[in-house]
Amino acid sequence: MKFMKYAVFFYTSVGIEPYTIDSRSKKASLWSHLLFWANVINLSVIVFGEILYLGVAYSDGKFIDAVTVLSYIGFVIVGMSKMFFIWWKKTDLSDLVKELEHIYPNGKAEEEMYRLDRYLRSCSRISITYALLYSVLIWTFNLFSIMQFLVYEKLLKIRVVGQTLPYLMYFPWNWHENWTYYVLLFCQNFAGHTSASGQISTDLLLCAVATQVVMHFDYLARVVEKQVLDRDWSENSRFLAKTVQYHQRILRLMDVLNDIFGIPLLLNFMVSTFVICFVGFQMTVGVPPDIMIKLFLFLFSSLSQVYLICHYGQLIADASSSLSISAYKQNWQNADIRYRRALVFFIARPQRTTYLKATIFMNITRATMTDLLQVSYKFFALLRTMYIK
């Protein structure tokens, strides 16, 4: 499916087959399993080392280092949770994709009726931009220590950088000036790629599915509004029955979508609240300009991720509620009285807005981002107060 290609690319890079592909060979599946568990084990070891470092930094009174490593841990938690929930919900996701393929427009005529090209261009543009942003973020972090070494020590010769690693971790041995440095550098870069790809792939998958849901809602709204009604109750009732059935299929898609993504989205919002707070705090404690650029990129990427999810949540809410307005715009005045009475019930259902949900606790719209930023700022103010004291 064209909408899914970018998400599948990033899932493949971490060894995940997000939904069943009948044509996939057993050899490819075996390689995917090996790659997946290599990613998981490596990432788990790295985050365990970061957690140990957090304890050491806190006990030694290194407040800034503790906050820094907390932002790294939060980033990993979001990436791992998204990967594991997609891996766990593979059967449900496969059924969802099959249903999307079943109602996908076939042929040039249907594609034009659905305005497929418009939605596909929008999804592709957002997917590419978002994937590039996160890729630049993670590789800026991964290669930052190497670039510092090459620029400051080798090129400009203004200070000695030495061997440094991208992320703060606890090590029970001295890795400086020996071969283990290169192993650790590779493992940390590998872990950074895994965590970023886990987030990119799941966010792009959500983007692809949400775009198709909006496309079907919009198509149904146009069909309902443009339907020419007359006094033929038999024909009008058949049209209304088909409309209700189509609407129910879209609502079932949303139920499955919320079931698959609900918990990962809730974790995403909870952790992102603290990550935004931690990164913002680091930017206010007098870091060098090069570190400031890195932190700004981290903050901007985290905000972009939250906005992307909230944006698609808003699109789904708007598209679902607009169906009742389209039904009211019909020329129902010309229809049989029985159709008018039935139409009242149809109009009532879309007035109960369909939301993208982070479980039962949160309906996601653009207002959700405002709420998240308010909470994040409160924690930021608390953190600043603790640091000053």
From Swiss-Prot:
Belongs to the insect chemoreceptor superfamily. Heteromeric odorant receptor channel (TC 1.A.69) family. Or49a subfamily. The keyword Transmembrane applies. The atypical heteromeric and topological design of the odorant receptors appears to be an insect-specific solution for odor recognition, making the OR/Orco complex an attractive target for the development of highly selective insect repellents to disrupt olfactory-mediated host-seeking behaviors of insect disease vectors. Odor-evoked OR currents are independent of known G-protein-coupled second messenger pathways. It comes from Drosophila melanogaster (Fruit fly). Pfam families: 7tm_6 (PF02949). Residues 1-33, 88-130, 221-259, 312-359 are cytoplasmic. It is found in: Cell membrane. Its main location: membrane. Interacts with Orco. Complexes exist early in the endomembrane system in olfactory sensory neurons (OSNs), coupling these complexes to the conserved ciliary trafficking pathway. Glycans are attached at residue 178. The keyword Transmembrane applies. One of its GO terms (biological process) is detection of chemical stimulus involved in sensory perception of smell. Keywords: Cell membrane, Glycoprotein, Membrane, Olfaction, Receptor, Sensory transduction, Transducer, Transmembrane, Transmembrane helix. GO terms for cellular component: cation channel complex; dendrite membrane; plasma membrane. This is Odorant receptor 85c. Odorant receptor which mediates acceptance or avoidance behavior, depending on its substrates. The odorant receptor repertoire encodes a large collection of odor stimuli that vary widely in identity, intensity, and duration. May form a complex with Orco to form odorant-sensing units, providing sensitive and prolonged odorant signaling and calcium permeability. The gene is Or85c.
